[in-house]
UniProtKB/Swiss-Prot annotation:
GO terms for biological process: menaquinone biosynthetic process. The keyword Iron does not apply. InterPro entries: MenaQ_synth_MenD, MenD_middle, THDP-binding, Thiamin_PyroP_enz_TPP-bd_dom, TPP_enzyme_TPP-bd. Keywords: Magnesium, Manganese, Menaquinone biosynthesis, Metal-binding, Thiamine pyrophosphate, Transferase. Catalyzes the thiamine diphosphate-dependent decarboxylation of 2-oxoglutarate and the subsequent addition of the resulting succinic semialdehyde-thiamine pyrophosphate anion to isochorismate to yield 2-succinyl-5-enolpyruvyl-6-hydroxy-3-cyclohexene-1-carboxylate (SEPHCHC). Homodimer. GO terms for molecular function: 2-succinyl-5-enolpyruvyl-6-hydroxy-3-cyclohexene-1-carboxylic-acid synthase activity; magnesium ion binding; manganese ion binding; thiamine pyrophosphate binding. Pfam families: TPP_enzyme_C (PF02775), TPP_enzyme_M_2 (PF16582), TPP_enzyme_N (PF02776). Its cofactor is Mg(2+); Mn(2+); thiamine diphosphate. It comes from the Bacteria. Binds 1 thiamine pyrophosphate per subunit. This is 2-succinyl-5-enolpyruvyl-6-hydroxy-3-cyclohexene-1-carboxylate synthase. Belongs to the TPP enzyme family. MenD subfamily.
């Protein structure tokens, strides 16, 4: 009996089962112990293969692919700390709803806890973060193939969001020619190999029913809060709120067009919050709210009913309102709960939103990161998409810009880490094939710098804007101790990115004014390559501009 041959047949069943559950993209890191999985993936023509040498970046690449494709994405890594590097992407997927299938190769049980090389305790290492965890046995013909395929099908068939960890131990030898070992074991799956359906088909998940008293609540004074959702959902939510005559507070990720722009500014005005207190119901569609003032208002508001609609399961309200948690696809829920045409009940808020935007426009000429955040909608590629980083940049765009309704916006706003942002943006571009504008800060770019290798392979123009404010300037918005702020919070690195771009053979520009930036963008959108645009700005100007605008709008 050939151990290596049966390892590959065992792996082939696993990989084929994944294809029946909609997996098309598979991300592979180099490794020896994962050889059976890698070769099985390479031989399966149903997969689109992606490779990367850094497992942490690989996990985030898969995350980006899953964001756009809306399908589960598989990841193959070898044993040891390679597995641990997938933790950040797994955590993010669990919070934002992407489906990741982590296939982690492992040493067999007799090599664990005995000093064997590259052997760690992998089963259960991700704690409660995976939706499902499977610790497969060592490949053996004593276990029928139908057990293996049905185990995979059950985990994926019941997966609505988050990750599945499938730990796969393989004994040596890992290499060798294929023979007939295990062929009859594999063939016992019969004509399953010829069709395209799962071995085990799970019943679909039941979602929340129609709220029978909706006809009553839609006649009340309501507020719509729009969090993270798809571009198509964003347009529908905007129309729904407009028909109801309810004010819509749209997050940067809502893709609603933010009909009341600069919400994080005008929510700091007492006139706005006073008017919002008249709301009898708040309907929040989507989670992951960004703006600080929005979160403060959301925590303090006390309507008669607070409804949260999102297809992600679990509690999504850190303010713990009394109300209803409705698990449903947002577009489907809107169809079940049609709007009734009514006149807008808010008078003060539209005026404040207009005045807040005018205050922002009055400051748009200076060359700085706050002004870039406001102007970002002017720089979006046609038929393209936007990827927004974390920390200060997403807050500035949320507060100062107005993105087009239905324009795709992606981010990692689940755990909101700055790790893996470039890798995620690479996945977003690959899955969509669209021109992509990505914007991150300098520390975020440094954190995931080797992901520039992934950005060499794009199918449409990709522009990476690195806003270099020399450190974590978001801490300038917080009451951090002044004497310790620079050394222990901001951590300025005093670096530029020209040589990093050159190392990976990417185009690079460092504009000094808006005209140079716009010229660089026009050039970048012409060719299907990646262009790094480093925008060097005064360190605290962005945070200070936001604080000045907050003070100004609060007194309107």
């Amino acid at each position: 009996m050939s151990v290596s041959a049966f390892n590959r047949r065992w792996a082939a069943v696993i990989l084929e089962a994944l294809t029946r559950q909609g997996v098309r993209h598979i991300c592979i890191a180099p490794g020896s112990r994962s050889t059976p999985l890698t070769l099985a993936a390479a031989e399966n023509s149903a997969f689109i293969h992606h490779t990367h040498f850094d497992e942490r970046g690989l996990g985030h690449l898969a995350l980006g692919l899953a964001k756009v494709s809306k399908q589960p994405v598989a990841v193959i890594v070898t044993s040891g700390t390679a597995v641990a590097n997938l933790y950040p992407a797994l955590i993010e997927a669990g919070l934002t709803g992407e489906k990741l299938i982590l296939l982690t190769a492992d040493r067999p049980p007799e090599l664990i806890d005995c000093g064997a090389n590259q052997a760690i305790r992998q089963p259960g290492m991700f704690a409660s973060h995976p939706t499902h965890s499977i610790s497969l046995p060592r490949p053996t013909q004593d276990i029928p193939a139908r057990w293996l395929v049905s185990t995979i099908d059950h985990a994926l068939g019941t997966l609505h969001a988050g990750g599945v960890h499938i730990n796969c131990p393989f004994a040596e030898p890992l290499y060798g020619e294929m023979d007939d070992t295990g062929l009859s074991w594999q063939q016992r799956l019969g004509d399953w190999w010829q069709d395209d359906k799962p071995w085990l088909r799970e019943a679909p998940r039941l979602e929340s029913e129609k709220q029978r008293d909706w006809f009553f609540w839609r006649q009340k004074r309501g507020v719509v809060v729009a969090g993270r959702m798809s571009a198509e959902e964003g347009k529908k939510v905007a129309l729904w709120a407009q028909t109801l005559g309810w004010p819509l507070i749209g997050d940067v990720l809502s893709q609603t067009g933010q009909p009341l722009p600069c919400a994080d500014l005008w929510l700091g005005n007492a006139k706005a919050t006073s008017e919002l207190q008249q709301a009898q119901i708040v309907v929040q569609l989507g989670s992951s709210l960004t703006g600080k003032r929005l979160l403060q208002w959301q925590a303090s508001c006390e309507p008669e009913e607070y409804w949260i609609v999102d297809d992600i399961e679990g509690r999504l309200d850190p303010a713990h309102h009394r109300g209803r948690r409705l698990i449903a696809n947002i577009a489907d829920w809107l169809e079940q709960h049609p709007a009734e045409k009514r006149q807008p009940w808010c008078v003060e808020i539209p005026r404040l939103a207009e005045q807040a935007m005018q205050a922002v426009i009055a400051r748009r000429d200076a060359f700085g990161e706050a002004q870039l955040a406001h102007r970002i909608s002017d720089y979006l590629p046609e038929q393209g998409q936007l990827f927004v980083g974390n920390s200060l940049v997403v807050r500035l765009i949320d507060a100062l810009s107005q993105l087009p309704a239905g324009y795709p916006v992606y981010s990692n706003r689940g755990a909101s880490g700055i790790d893996g942002l470039l890798s995620t943006a690479a996945g977003v571009q690959r899955a969509s094939g669209k021109p992509t504008l990505a914007i991150v800060g300098d520390l975020s770019a440094l954190y995931d710098l080797n992901a520039l290798a992934l950005l060499r392979q794009v199918s449409a123009p990709l522009v990476l804007i690195v806003v270099n404010n020399n450190g974590g300037q978001i801490f300038s918005l917080l009451p951090t101790p002044k004497n310790e702020r620079e050394r222990f919070y901001l951590m300025p690195q005093n670096v530029h990115f020209e040589h990093a771009a050159a190392m990976f053979e990417l185009k690079y520009h460092r504009p000094q004014n808006w005209q140079e930036l716009e010229t660089a963008l026009v050039d970048a959108w012409r060719t299907p390559t990646t262009t790094v645009i480093e925008m060097v700005v005064n360190d605290t100007d962005g945070a200070q501009t936001l604080q000045q605008l907050l003070a100004q709008v609060s007194h309107l």
